[in-house]
Amino acid sequence: MFPGARILATLTLALHLLHGTHAAIGPTGDMYIVNEDVSPDGFTRSAVVARSDPTTNGTSETLTGVLVQGNKGDNFQLNVLNQLSDTTMLKTTSIHWHGFFQSGSTWADGPAFVNQCPIASGNSFLYDFNVPDQAGTFWYHSHLSTQYCDGLRGPFIVYDPSDPHLSLYDVDNADTIITLEDWYHVVAPQNAVLPTADSTLINGKGRFAGGPTSALAVINVESNKRYRFRLISMSCDPNFTFSIDGHSLQVIEADAVNIVPIVVDSIQIFAGQRYSFVLNANQTVDNYWIRADPNLGSTGFDGGINSAILRYAGATEDDPTTTSSTSTPLEETNLVPLENPGAPGPAVPGGADININLAMAFDVTNFELTINGSPFKAPTAPVLLQILSGATTAASLLPSGSIYSLEANKVVEISIPALAVGGPHPFHLHGHTFDVIRSAGSTTYNFDTPARRDVVNTGTDANDNVTIRFVTDNPGPWFLHCHIDWHLEIGLAVVFAEDVTSITAPPAAWDDLCPIYDALSDSDKGGIA
């Protein structure tokens, strides 16, 4: 980046920090992983949270982790310090920076037992990676078992001073981030195998059915300003139907990919997905309900559940009395990439260099979810360590049946027929975005202007056969998994071992993670009832 552009980028980030009210770190900084008593919905419990400060003062009324932010072109150096002590939850950890390609830094991607061993309590690990050509809305979360369901998740924004949509909005800062989370009153290691959330949190706050009238998140706007809201589903399970009473949403980004603007009034968002939309605050000064209705658990909005408040400057500090009326939902097939649209390879189904069908199934006997007959079971040695130790083929890599070798510079087509059990399943591919040449609910293949993203809903209908394409231009072991964390825990994942002979060596500190972790006792690892 030339000096003038670097100065502009620094000023841009400074303005975002100045106008935002939330604590933030980035592109360098310390992230403390701590246990903290939280009461985001009026129920108090211990949680695993990410903070910019290791000290805790009483019970926190919000859950969402520290915001990480920077600019396109930045080098991120995020030092994760594990200070976990509560043995009822996992005490080790690893962090995945969701949506980043990690080109040349697959060791920093974060999934435990795929790209690294977990970080032991009392230890730290520096995630050092470059973001040369990505900008948009990302997030981070634990990628160890179901730990992020206990709270370890937060937003990650990369701003682009040359954003092609810059003329469409006036405000884009920390206060225009909207996070959606499902929250559980029982810690994950002691919860049911497939639990139902107790509440929905919007920006870390919410209410549960039958619970107290706890404070809801309030998002403040001024009349006649245009706001870029960044909507992030940090869900462990449910998808949400999101809307804001009385307002249309001009969608301009999906999963950190700029799109041709499209106006809707509701968005169905699945675990791991992100959207940016522009809201024009051109309605009567008042309070308006923000709604995020989950597909599971306590649905609806009685008593303010699944809700937050959009408040115009000058409005009273009361709950809204508005009603919902939506008729134009977002359709994935209408998401057209702004830059370089079009899927790689011949415009015919099955015409890629490598074509793989991934058939999901539910093994009732073993209570496992499988892909092509195999449940993913975390190996004792991370897949990356196995590769660096000389294992380079699917046959020699563990877990057996869950590794797929991919040659360099090939067009890959993945088809994922729907599984109704536990569906719809949102699948996330690490290390890449992909083109969705066939979406859920559609029988049409679109090679010219397919949606481009990194999490795709695979549908529930027997006729659904979601199909994606990408190019193997990024060496590494890359996870492909259901982003319903409870489903990943019982096997719904595979690993693509991509161009393994070109993988670069990790730093020395990475080499120390496994010996330290392997020496831990069960008590040191946590998750004990």
Swiss-Prot record:
Binds 4 Cu cations per monomer. The gene is POX1. Keywords: Copper, Disulfide bond, Glycoprotein, Lignin degradation, Metal-binding, Oxidoreductase, Repeat, Secreted, Signal. It comes from Pleurotus ostreatus (Oyster mushroom). Cu cation 2 binds at H98, H141, H483. Pfam families: Cu-oxidase, Cu-oxidase_2, Cu-oxidase_3. This is Laccase-1. GO terms for molecular function: copper ion binding; hydroquinone:oxygen oxidoreductase activity. Belongs to the multicopper oxidase family. It is found in: Secreted. Residues 25-159, 170-312, 380-499 form the Plastocyanin-like domain. The keyword Repeat applies. One of its GO terms (cellular component) is extracellular region. PROSITE patterns: MULTICOPPER_OXIDASE1, MULTICOPPER_OXIDASE2. Cu cation 3 binds at H143, H430, H481. It catalyses: 4 hydroquinone + O2 = 4 benzosemiquinone + 2 H2O. Cu cation 1 binds at H96, H428. InterPro entries: Cu-oxidase-like_N, Cu-oxidase_2nd, Cu-oxidase_C, Cu-oxidase_fam, Cu_oxidase_CS, Cu_oxidase_Cu_BS, Cupredoxin. Its EC number is 1.10.3.2. Gene3D superfamilies: Cupredoxins - blue copper proteins. It is an enzyme of class 1 (oxidoreductase). Disulfide bonds join C117-C514, C149-C236. GO terms for biological process: lignin catabolic process. Cu cation 4 binds at H425, C482, H487. Residues 1-23 form the signal peptide.
